[in-house]
Amino acid sequence: MKALHFGAGNIGRGFIGKLLADAGIQLTFADVNQVVLDALNARHSYQVHVVGETEQVDTVSGVNAVSSIGDDVVDLIAQVDLVTTAVGPVVLERIAPAIAKGLVKRKEQGNESPLNIIACENMVRGTTQLKGHVMNALPEDAKAWVEEHVGFVDSAVDRIVPPSASATNDPLEVTVETFSEWIVDKTQFKGALPNIPGMELTDNLMAFVERKLFTLNTGHAITAYLGKLAGHQTIRDAILDEKIRAVVKGAMEESGAVLIKRYGFDADKHAAYIQKILGRFENPYLKDDVERVGRQPLRKLSAGDRLIKPLLGTLEYGLPHKNLIEGIAAAMHFRSEDDPQAQELAALIADKGPQAALAQISGLDANSEVVSEAVTAYKAMQ
């Protein structure tokens, strides 16, 4: 089996690329970073530090790389069985024209073996969005052929891969946590379902997308925002602060009650999942900075994201949300010199006041009880 993976950054090398290569798949990375491309093509291998209770070093081998903006990547799309991405939500639109060109070439070459494309991004139904961009870039006469022969498979991914400086200045070395989860929608594949260890197949992807968003992402963000307010440097420092831990755990339990109601998750299993996530935040090997995790507060306070979406669920089912409100209030206090969204948030609050600002960012009704609760909590933190 041959695969092409867009994005040779830390997540590409440390998570998806590693799973594909470990499964014995012939893997080529596509990227724009020439230093990384040259290193991959010179060595065809790299090291991954897997850290949890213990630390181990795995070697990923048999890989090579091409530029994501040249002809090589178009040629590969015409030949491979699987295309994956870990480029970040914004970049999906930029790689779509190259994918479209490759699909046209595949059609011209008469290659009708199934191709599946999986975007592995921190977003909901990212592959469906990528498909829209690809379809827009395709000529009309290729669209029906692509619909017939190419699967666009949505997925949910979860592995913490913080940026970390290599002790040896190796551009390929990467550190990842032990935990990883890659769940894909098995109803969207063309041809036989792949057997890749570490890839889980489901016919109810949205349940798992929301489980991750409402637990890992919600908890991570609230830990960061409360941690920053309390003067902590890392996620580990913050979650070991008992006051912060109580709010974070409480918020994940509140969002969890929504998931249990909505999708029928088992309550005991979900409680264990929350404990596992708290353990991940405590990982001493992951020097995850609260400022990095908290960045882009406007996006994180938007209606479909990790703070407001679970809050809306608690309103839908009439469930408690005190700790989620604390997290939202802390997010409104997030300030960072290096983050344009943090500066925009501060300016908006200074200009309109917290009530109107939160309503504008989140889509919540300015006169609602929850906005009033959040503003009260926000003022109590000043």
Swiss-Prot record:
One of its GO terms (molecular function) is mannitol-1-phosphate 5-dehydrogenase activity. It catalyses: D-mannitol 1-phosphate + NAD(+) = beta-D-fructose 6-phosphate + NADH + H(+). The keyword Calcium does not apply. PROSITE patterns: MANNITOL_DHGENASE (PS00974). NAD(+) binds at residues 3-14. It holds the Pfam family Mannitol_dh_C. NCBIfam families: PRK02318.1-2 (NF002646), PRK02318.1-3 (NF002647), PRK02318.1-4 (NF002648), PRK02318.2-2 (NF002650), PRK02318.2-5 (NF002652). Belongs to the mannitol dehydrogenase family. This is Mannitol-1-phosphate 5-dehydrogenase. The lineage of its organism: Bacteria, Pseudomonadati, Pseudomonadota, Gammaproteobacteria, Enterobacterales.
